């Protein structure tokens, strides 16, 4: 039972009451909270804290900053242990004087008596009154918890102590996401001071951090970043020594003391393989007709790209080789969708489907996050952190990467501020597609003789992609010279003759000349329009017939040889 968790399913009346009170008080609460806790707050995201953490690690690893300790804490059963009186007192201290009224009293009164029943596999228990609780799953639960934990950040801010100075200037408070807490301090006395402060403040709220269980596992860890010191302090959590690790999971990402992205990428690659399997299962089980490619691309965007690129836009020092790992996995998905071999020219997927490579998607997301940063209030901790990094970059800083992105897309930094979110999104999308098209055409001209007959004017999905699955696959193979002809896979070997008539080379161009195929082919038209933007229905039928006839005759000849 110790690991069982649940949320409160509230009555409709209680939900409506909570929402009405929440709408009246939220803006006042949010405006008076510090930048320490981002949980349950609008227009704030886990990316904000990760962006700061990665930036500080990079400034230590690649800059001249002193070694630091990252102190990662998790509060044990936080919502179960929260004290309603303490949470409402914290809300009272947070809101302005004009909201010191009956609304706060109404929140308190509505949570004093809670008739709770537990739903389990065998039914439901009888209802018992559990007084004065913070309801996890209710409207007020997350913001009450975030505001209560935010008092730690406020005390650091107001007392001007237990914060980290980024590049000696920007004050970084302890970073929290509801009940997940990350403290940053220079290794030494400052680290001990922060550790003592956080532990004491949590105990004063009648809460506890996780301590090692009977198996020695704990959710509270210390990551040392930078050169090791002889007097690197031992930190404690409620009297128990804090475990020191090389990396730890925080807000969904793996934070590594060496500042590298390798473990995050390995984790996302593994996740991506599972997502590809799920996508292909869906596509193969359901008959989608002419919507096959459209739905496949929607699944690629929503499940695959969003699944593997979570937070990737704020990673520091992301190398091209690391991006290529993602693109390799992406092409694996596209290969399975189009049923083509590994040797298919990689630029052909994007030019034929009208989609963007993963690397350019990351660039787009980086610029969108840059737009978010530039439009923050100048008093915001995150904005000050960003401006310091923009003006005083360290090798490997995020701002160096995004400067290159702006240059690639032809967007000026000083024009970002003031642009609407909708406008910048459209501008980035337009410029990204132009940039991607130019890069893909360079690859086509440089690397791929197979695509020599194909002409493109812009990056868009080819019209034949609205055909059925079988037609799309066969046309794509013919256009990219990946159909099952010997000359398409010669790779330096001697010429291949047609296995059916042995009178000409076994290639796509000569397939209509084959006597064996001509005897069974109903249509005699030219199929040169296969390389154009408008492919006729007759050409599609001829291609399907050629593939079908070749397969049948080759299988027949193979069977005859075995029988003989």
What is the predicted function of each stretch?
Residues 9-14, 38-47, 60-63, 76-80, ...:
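Conserved, non-catalytic sequence blocks in retroelement Pol enzymes and Pol-derived host proteins
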Residues 5, 17, 21, 25, ...:
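Mobile genetic element proteins and their domesticated derivatives, centered on retroelements
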Residues 5, 37, 68-79, 133-137, ...:
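Catalytic palm active-site di-aspartate
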Residues 178, 239-316, 372, 380:
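Basic, alpha-helical interaction scaffolds
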Residues 1-151:
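Conserved pre-catalytic core of RNA-dependent polymerases
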Residues 282, 286-289, 441-446, 450-564:
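Family-specific functional microsites
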Residues 299-301, 325-330, 339-486, 490, ...:
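Extended C-terminal regions of large enzymes
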Residues 107-110, 211-246, 267:
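Short, conserved micro-motifs composed of acidic
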């Amino acid at each position: 039972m110790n690991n069982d968790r649940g949320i409160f399913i509230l009555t409709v009346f209680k939900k409506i009451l909570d929402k009405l009170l929440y709408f009246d008080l939220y803006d006042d609460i949010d405006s008076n909270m510090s930048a320490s806790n981002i949980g349950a707050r609008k227009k704030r995201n886990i990316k904000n804290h990760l962006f700061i953490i990665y930036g500080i690690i990079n400034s230590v690893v690649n800059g001249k900053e002193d070694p630091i300790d990252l102190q990662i804490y998790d509060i044990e059963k936080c919502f179960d242990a929260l004290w309603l009186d303490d949470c409402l007192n914290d809300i009272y201290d947070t809101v302005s004087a004009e909201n010191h009224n009956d609304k706060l009293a109404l929140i308190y009164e509505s949570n004093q008596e809670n008739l709770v029943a537990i739903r389990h596999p065998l039914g439901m228990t009888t209802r018992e009154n559990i007084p004065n609780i913070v309801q996890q799953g209710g409207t007020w639960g997350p913001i009450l918890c975030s505001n209560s934990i935010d008092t730690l950040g406020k005390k650091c801010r107001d007392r001007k102590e237990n914060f980290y100075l980024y590049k000696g200037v920007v004050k970084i408070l302890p970073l929290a996401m509801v009940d997940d807490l990350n403290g940053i301090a220079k290794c030494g006395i400052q680290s001990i001071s922060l550790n003592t402060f956080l532990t004491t403040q949590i105990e004063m709220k009648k809460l506890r951090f996780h301590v090692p269980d009977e198996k020695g596992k704990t959710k509270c860890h210390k990551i040392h970043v930078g050169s090791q010191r002889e007097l690197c302090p031992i930190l404690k959590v409620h009297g128990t020594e804090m475990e020191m690790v090389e990396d730890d999971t925080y807000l969904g990402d793996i934070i590594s003391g060496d500042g590298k992205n390798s473990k995050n990428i390995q984790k996302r690659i593994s996740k991506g393989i599972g997502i590809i399997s799920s996508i292909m299962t869906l596509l193969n089980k359901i008959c989608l007709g002419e919507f096959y490619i459209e739905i496949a691309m929607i699944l690629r965007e929503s499940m695959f790209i969003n699944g593997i690129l979570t937070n990737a836009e704020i990673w520091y020092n992301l190398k091209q080789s690391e991006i290529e790992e993602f693109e390799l996995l992406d092409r694996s998905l596209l290969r399975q969708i189009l049923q083509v071999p590994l040797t298919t020219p990689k630029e052909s997927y994007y030019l034929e489907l009208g989609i963007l490579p993963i690397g350019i998607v990351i660039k787009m997301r980086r610029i969108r996050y840059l737009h978010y940063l530039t439009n923050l209030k100048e008093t915001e901790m995150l904005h000050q952190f960003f401006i310091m990094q923009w003006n005083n970059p360290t090798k490997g800083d995020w701002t160096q990467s995004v400067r290159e992105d702006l240059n690639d897309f032809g967007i000026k930094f000083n024009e970002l501020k003031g642009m609407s979110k909708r406008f910048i999104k459209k501008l980035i999308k337009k410029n990204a597609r132009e940039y991607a098209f130019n890069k893909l055409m360079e690859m086509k001209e440089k690397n791929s003789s197979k695509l020599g007959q194909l002409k493109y004017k812009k990056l868009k999905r080819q019209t034949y992609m609205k055909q059925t699955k079988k037609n799309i696959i066969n046309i794509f193979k013919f256009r990219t010279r990946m159909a099952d002809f010997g000359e398409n896979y010669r790779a330096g070997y001697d010429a291949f003759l047609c296995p059916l008539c042995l009178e000409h080379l076994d290639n796509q161009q000569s397939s209509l000349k084959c006597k064996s195929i001509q005897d069974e082919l109903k249509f005699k038209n030219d199929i040169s329009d296969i390389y154009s933007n408008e492919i006729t229905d007759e050409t599609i039928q001829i291609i399907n017939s050629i593939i079908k006839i070749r397969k049948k005759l080759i299988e027949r000849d193979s069977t005859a040889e075995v029988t003989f």
